[in-house]
């Protein structure tokens, strides 16, 4: 840095040149001694432009500070006719364009490098986090997935087994009952047909009426006995006893009320059935063979 200053006399113009490789900084202007109150308007001319930079007065502003920089030749002048004006400042070496380019490039590199480092750091952090998650996810999911698969397989096996067992049980439970129902229905229908179709041979009126009255009375008692007695008592029937049959309680047979005193309760009937003396048929109640013999064998 180099100090600089000059005097501009009244009515004159002074040329100033910063010099090669320097810039001139205009710092201050002061009004010289004057016996009269005088004002001085200062000008600077650069190329073809003339600009006013300030006004000095003995009473109010004897000096003014500036902050003007010039990098090429310029001219200073003022309007005072009685006193001179003094300008002061300093010169500074001007940085070359190459140096400026280097400085600018360095600044740009620094500005670019800082965000790049941040972005790279963020990217690295993101990559690390993603890798950690990717490593943690399979390790956590592998045992859970295996357990879930095993549980699903076991549940499916259990459901399949339970469904098969239920279907088997239902088939086994229904088949004997259906068979028993069919057999009991066939027995009932065959007995009813045999008992309800009497064929008397003798023309005797008294016996015929007695036979008809007995035939009409006995089927009702037989039917009541058949309804009251459980299917488990038909062990001496035509088709034999059924296996594992769900039957009503045998106690219900006790609640049957019959006004006919001649008809006995099913308890007196033997388990093997009452056989007919004339043929090989057997009946559950004791009165059924009598009606059968009267209807089929003519009361023998």
Swiss-Prot record:
One of its GO terms (cellular component) is nucleolus. Residues 279-290 have a biased composition (Polar residues). This is Histone deacetylase HDT3. Belongs to the histone deacetylase HD2 family. Residues 265-275 have a biased composition (Low complexity). Mediates the deacetylation of lysine residues on the N-terminal part of the core histones (H2A, H2B, H3 and H4). Histone deacetylation gives a tag for epigenetic repression and plays an important role in transcriptional regulation, cell cycle progression and developmental events. Its main location: nucleus. It is found in: Nucleus, Nucleolus. It comes from Zea mays. Residues 119-132, 198-211 have a biased composition (Basic and acidic residues). Pfam families: NPL. Disulfide bonds: none annotated. Keywords: Chromatin regulator, Hydrolase, Metal-binding, Nucleus, Phosphoprotein, Repressor, Transcription, Transcription regulation, Zinc, Zinc-finger. Residues 98-300 are annotated as: Disordered. GO terms for molecular function: hydrolase activity; zinc ion binding.
């Amino acid at each position: 840095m180099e100090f600089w200053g000059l005097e501009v006399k009244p009515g004159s113009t002074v040329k100033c040149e910063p010099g090669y490789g320097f810039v001139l900084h205009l710092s201050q202007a002061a009004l010289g001694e004057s016996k009269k109150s005088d004002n001085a308007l200062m000008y600077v001319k650069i190329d073809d432009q003339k600009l006013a930079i300030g006004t000095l007065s003995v009473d109010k502003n004897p000096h003014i500070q500036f902050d003007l920089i010039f990098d090429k030749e310029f001219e200073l002048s003022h309007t005072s006719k009685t006193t001179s004006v003094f300008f002061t400042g300093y010169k500074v070496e001007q940085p070359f364009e190459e140096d400026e380019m280097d400085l600018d490039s360095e600044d740009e590199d620094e500005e670019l490098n800082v965000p790049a480092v941040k972005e790279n750091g963020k990217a690295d952090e993101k990559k690390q986090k993603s890798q950690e998650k990717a490593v943690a996810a399979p390790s956590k999911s592998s045992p859970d997935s295996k357990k879930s698969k095993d549980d699903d397989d076991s549940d499916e096996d259990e459901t399949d087994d339970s469904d098969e067992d239920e279907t088997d049980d239902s088939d086994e439970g229904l088949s004997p009952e259906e068979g028993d129902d069919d057999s009991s229905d066939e027995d009932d229908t065959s007995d009813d047909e045999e008992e309800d179709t009497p064929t008397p041979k003798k023309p005797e009126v008294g016996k015929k009426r007695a036979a008809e009255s007995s035939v009409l009375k006995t089927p009702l008692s037989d039917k009541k006995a058949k309804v009251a007695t459980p299917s488990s008592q038909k062990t001496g029937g035509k088709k034999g006893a059924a296996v594992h049959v769900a039957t009503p309680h045998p106690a219900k047979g006790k609640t049957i009320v019959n006004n006919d005193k001649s008809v006995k309760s099913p308890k007196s009937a033997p388990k093997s059935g009452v056989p007919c003396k004339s043929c090989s048929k057997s009946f559950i109640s004791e009165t059924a063979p009598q009606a059968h013999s009267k209807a089929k064998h003519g009361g023998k």
